[in-house]
Amino acid sequence: MVDIIIPVYNALDTLELAVTSALMQGDVRILLVDDGSTDGTARLCDELAHHPRIAVIHQQNRGVSAARNAGLQAAASEWLTFLDADDVLLPDAIGNLLALAGDSQAIQGLVTRSEAPDVPECTVQTLPSRDMLDLALRNPTVHLHTHGWLLRREICNERFNESLRLGEDGEWMMRVLRGTKTVARAQVNAYCYHLRADSAVHSAADVVREYLRTLTAAQPTLNYLDMPDAAAQYRLMHLLLMLTHGVVQEGGFRDGLRQCGAIRRLCREAFRADLRRVRWLPRSKAQAVLLMLRCGLYPLARRAILIRRRQNQQACVSAESAI
């Protein structure tokens, strides 16, 4: 059996779809953790819990990390996975991942933004945990999150850091993967992530401060892993997140000057050593922006990030209109 942990907060419009996708997975138990919802979601959770395979936990509002921790505490099956209340598991995701997991302690499926994605050739790659961690640190937005992961409960003794607000799932996944021996990566469509505009309003200062707090919390694990190049890439990808979701905003000439000044200070004060590791021949758009930052081309980097922000916002609008 697999426990599916669903942290829930004010998800009245989306929860039933998420739960339906979970029930279709077969031999599963669903743990709904209501984090102090105020819109009728708590009552809906109680109604859904009449199903024999659904249990509900109610708690005061303490944030998604506390809700996930409550789910971890209640989990009792050999395997577990997480599902956000506004996303869905794709058909046969759990069964396909279990069939490919073998002796691995964790397996990652594909995350899509479509409920009817192209079907890839079903293959699996098994990696030593250190190789997987190297890959994950270099690509944290792809690998260091809870979406699409199926985990043996025996490796999930770590708890989410409830003081973190941004990037907390990646910091937790890094600690969990540290305790594995082998990890599998499967070419299996597993999880549909419904891209939405963030309902929480964060100021630029809040975004920078919260991501820096996450990096501080992650540093002991990074020190333990002793992967300096991969750790630098992990931190630099968080720098790009800070800039994209916090510092860089639309605005006029004076706004641009002020933002470029903030970018320069952040790069010089917190990321100078990491930027020195950036390759001179970038292999991706993200690496190209990091090279601009290394070279002090802050206006050019800001422009590239603005383009990326506009693409993200358009994707959010398209996703919302499709629902």
Where on the chain are the PLM-derived regions?
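Short, acidic, metal-binding catalytic loop of nucleotide-sugar glycosyltransferases
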Residues: 20-29
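Short aromatic/hydrophobic "clamp" motif used to bind/position activated sugar donors
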Residues: 80
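Catalytic core of nucleotide-sugar-dependent glycosyltransferases
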Residues: 189-197, 202-230, 249-271
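Conserved donor NDP-sugar-binding/catalytic core segment of glycosyltransferases
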Residues: 92-121
